[in-house]
Amino acid sequence: LICHNRPLPFLHKTCPEGQNICYKMTLKKTPMKLSVKRGCAATCPSERPLVQVECCKTDKCNW
């Protein structure tokens, strides 16, 4: 699986074995959904009060 891991669309990495989910965290209270963090995970990270989490399982799907 290949996931974006930086704010820029052309920067990505191959996930380590066992990490089969791409995730993207964005701030909930901003008009443009400012991205906070992207990367690979074994399980989808939990949402937080001010952070929305989106998870997916295809290459580069977390843009």
From Swiss-Prot:
GO terms for cellular component: extracellular region. Coiled coil: none annotated. Keywords: Cardiotoxin, Disulfide bond, Secreted, Toxin. Disulfide bonds join C3-C22, C15-C40, C44-C55, C56-C61. The keyword Disulfide bond applies. The keyword Disulfide bond applies. InterPro entries: Cytotoxin_Cobra (IPR003572), Snake_3FTx (IPR003571), Snake_toxin-like_sf (IPR045860), Snake_toxin_con_site (IPR018354), Toxin_cobra-type (IPR054131). It is found in: Secreted. Expressed by the venom gland. It comes from the Eukaryota. SUPFAM superfamilies: Snake toxin-like. GO terms for molecular function: toxin activity. Belongs to the three-finger toxin family. Short-chain subfamily. Orphan group XIV sub-subfamily. Is classified as a P-type cytotoxin, since a proline residue stands at position 31 (Pro-31 in standard classification). This toxin has a very low toxicity. This is Cytotoxin homolog. The lineage of its organism: Eukaryota, Metazoa, Chordata, Craniata, Vertebrata.
